[in-house]
Amino acid sequence: MSNNMQSISNHTKLIKKMRVYFDNNRYEELALFLKESNCINEFHEDVDLQFYYYCLGSCRYYLDKEYKEALHDLQMALEYTYSPNNHYYTNYEILILSCIGKTYFSMGQVQKAFYYLHESLAALSSVSINENTYLLTRIFYNIATTHALNGTYEEAQIYLEKGIQFANQVHNSYYLSELFYEKAIISHLQRNIEVAIEEMYIASGVAKAVDNQELVALTQEKIDLWKE
C-alpha cells in the first residue's frame, strides 16, 4: 500500500473510532483516544479539525466540567466552517451551536445560552435529510434539559415532544430513550404520576432496544421507586 493510501486509511479509522465514542456518549474512552492517538496531527481538512475540537470540547464539558475551556474548544470548532451569513448549515455546525448554548448555561450566562440553543433550532430548517440527520435529535434534548434546569418545565416538555417527533420523522431511536426519560422526570415533578410511570416504561423499552444498559437500570430504578 502506498504512503498516501495508508494515510487515508489511518485517517478514516481515526474519524470512525471518534464517531463511535462520541455518538454513544463514551466520553472517557473518547478523551483517552484523543490523547493517546495524537490524532490531531492526522487531520488537515477543516471538517475533520472541527470534529476534533467538538469532541475535545465535549470531553472537557462532560468529564472535567471545565466550562470555559470547553467553550473555547467549541467556538474554535465552529469557526472552521461556520458563517452567520450561511444559508445552509452542516449537522455538526448545528450540534456545536447547541452545545455552546449548554455550556453558556453551565457558566451562568442564561441569555447567551438560550440564544445559541434557539440558533441551533432555527438552523435545522436549512438541513436536508441525510444518513446522519438523526444526530440532530440531540439538540432537542439539549434545549429541553436546559429549560428543565432553568425551571421552565412547560417549555421543556414542548421541546421534548418536538424531539420525539423529530426522531420518529428520521426513523431513528438516537436519544429517544433519553427524551422519554426526561419527559417522565418532568411529569413526575408536575405530580402527573401515572403519566410519568408510563413515559418511564417507554424510555425503558427504547433503552433495552438500543442496549443502553445504564439507562435501562436507571429507568427501572425510577419505576420501582414511583410505584411504591
What are these regions (language model features)?
Residues 21, 60-61, 97, 104, ...:
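Residue at a conserved register position within TPR or TPR-like alpha-solenoid repeats
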Residues 96-171, 175:
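Alpha-helical adaptor scaffolds
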Residues 17, 56-57, 100, 143, ...:
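Structural register within alpha-helical repeat arrays
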Residues 21-36, 63-79, 110-121, 152-161, ...:
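Helix-turn-helix repeat elements of alpha-solenoid scaffolds
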Residues 12, 51, 88, 95, ...:
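Residue register of alpha-helical TPR repeats
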Residues 34-42, 75-86, 118-129, 161-172, ...:
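Amphipathic alpha-helical segments of tetratricopeptide repeats
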Residues 8, 47-49, 84, 88-91, ...:
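Residue signature of alpha-solenoid helical repeat architecture, marking inter-repeat boundaries
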Residues 24, 63-64, 100, 107, ...:
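Structural motif corresponding to the intra-repeat A-B loop/turn of tetratricopeptide repeats
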